[in-house]
A protein has these predicted regions:
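Helix-coil boundary/capping segments in enzymes
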Residues: 1-106
């Protein structure tokens, strides 16, 4: 049996979150450009391939941005909902790799 190694607060940037930020945030262009240069932030299959180098390696995921810097009071509740839904999808799809996520608040 392989022992579990759980690493917490690993940053991800789901593409749906990037898309929403593109639509609502004036700070987004620079942040999105930086985020999209690192495939394991937004490409979960690439992340899983990287993780498979270490048997039993799991991640508790969180978003790679502070919500308040990407959306104002009018948009941050929707951004938090989208973010939490996307992180849940990732965890539900691969609970063997992502047993939990850190929820975001507006």
């Amino acid at each position: 049996m392989t022992s579990r190694k759980i690493d917490i607060y690993n940053h991800v940037m789901p593409t749906a979150v990037l898309d929403y930020m593109r639509d609502v945030s004036s700070a987004a262009p620079g942040m999105i450009k930086r985020m999209t240069t690192i495939p394991v932030l937004y490409d979960i299959e690439a992340r899983i391939r990287m993780m498979e180098q270490w048997p039993g390696y799991e991640q508790v995921i969180s978003v790679a941005i502070p919500m308040e810097s990407m959306a104002g009071p009018g948009d941050s509740p929707a951004l938090a909902r989208i973010t939490n839904a996307e992180l849940r999808k990732i965890c539900d799809g691969r609970p063997d790799k992502f047993p939990a996520w850190v929820a975001s608040l507006p």
